[in-house]
Regions:
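ATP-dependent adenylation/nucleotidyltransferase module used to activate substrates
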Residues: 1-165, 176, 185-186
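AMP-forming adenylation/ATP pyrophosphatase catalytic core
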Residues: 20, 132-367
């Protein structure tokens, strides 16, 4: 357990989503002697998104659950309205990346621009030393170098280090993740013993502002645009069918294409300007080299020589052996030992050495 070390109780802002994980994180920090304040970020207006107030992240129901847990713990609780910034930095970027042909990861952007930026600044302005979340990952300081390290959570099935790779040294110094050494079953057991209302609440799975998964419909509703139909092409550029708008398809997709070509085909490429989608056999999806930008290094100040690593190009992918090479400021080139299926521009590629996150970036190209 993370224990408070001095006589004055250090302040801890608990990012409370209304779920069981952040609730137990709050309880653990309180038990360790921290002066806790619960905060829920209001990120969307449900009526603006055309969604029910009970089916999105940080919804009215989530706020009610978080408030009830805070009341049970007898800690202060507030709701902070970040809807304007969330719209600009998360939703509008999400749409922009899709329209450019990529596949965005808004949860990573939310951690970067909202949770570990806005909340840290709010905590500092209110005299609090730490921001606490319910992520399954660990933060430790390297005694030899003094650098803060991000490590995998001990519960391999719940490890969330992938979505935290862009935390800076300054942020890591003020972040506490008390669930990093626990398993999910232990967390639920604690919540049940404390009689928390959300002890058996299901984990959120979808993009918070697109809970039904139909991101193309959301984009059309949000922007007022209509994404027109276009041509499916084979690898030779021959038309093989008609699609419903290139933004509706992701690299590696097989289901929902509506093509009868005698053998399974997958989305292999998209040309957003021409509004075409190229399809082909699964073997056309594999690439060995990934280029990344917007790179953030954690365990090292910068990459100066090639390093052996393992890497993930998707959230819960099994790590794959690779070598990472410097490729200019804020960039790297990653060469996998074996070709990887559908590494996709817009997604994060995160590098590991053992259980330590070396760093990561955003995929911009593959070959």
């Amino acid at each position: 357990m993370i224990e408070a070390q001095n006589t004055k109780r250090p302040g801890a802002l608990i990012a409370m989503s209304g779920g069981v994980d952040s609730s137990v994180a709050a309880w653990l920090m309180q038990q360790a002697g921290y002066d806790c304040t619960g905060i829920t970020m209001r990120l969307t207006r449900n009526e603006t998104l055309g969604q029910s107030g009970f089916h999105t992240c940080c919804s009215e129901k989530d706020i009610e659950d978080a408030a009830e847990v805070a009341f049970a713990m007898d800690i202060p609780y507030e709701v902070l309205d970040f809807t304007a910034d969330f719209r600009e930095k998360i939703i509008e970027k999400f749409i922009r990346v899709y329209e450019m042909g990529g596949t965005p990861n808004p949860c990573i952007d939310c951690n970067r621009y909202m949770k570990f930026d806005h909340l840290l600044r709010w905590a500092e302005s209110h005299g609090m030393e730490y921001v606490v979340t319910g992520h399954y990952a660990r933060v430790e300081q390297d005694e030899a170098t003094g650098r803060w390290l991000l490590k995998k959570g001990l519960d391999e099935g719940k490890d969330q280090s992938y979505v935290l790779y862009n935390l800076t040294q300054e942020q890591l110094a003020h972040v506490r993740l008390p669930l990093g050494t626990l398993h999910k079953a232990e967390v639920r057991e604690i919540a049940e013993k404390q009689h928390f209302i959300n002890a058996r609440k299901h984990d959120s799975q979808d993009i918070c502002f697109v809970p039904d998964g139909d991101y193309a419909r959301f984009m059309e509703d949000f922007t007022g645009k209509h994404y027109p139909a276009g041509d499916f092409l084979d690898k030779n550029g021959k038309k093989v069918g008609t699609h419903n708008g290139a933004v509706r398809y992701t690299i590696g997709q097989r289901k929902g294409l509506g093509l009868a070509m005698g053998a399974p085909v997958y989305v292999c490429a998209k040309d957003m300007q021409a509004n075409t989608v190229t399809v082909g056999p699964e073997e056309n999806l594999f690439d060995r080299i990934v280029y990344a930008d917007e790179v953030n290094w954690i365990a090292i100040p910068e990459l100066t020589t090639p390093l052996r690593v393992t890497a993930r190009t998707r959230y819960h992918q099994t790590e794959q052996a690779a070598t990472v090479y410097p490729a200019g400021e804020g960039q790297f080139r990653l060469e996998f030992d074996q070709p990887q299926r559908a590494p996709t521009p817009g997604q994060a590629v995160v590098l590991y050495q053992g259980d330590v996150v070396l760093g990561g970036g955003t995929i911009v190209a593959v070959e």
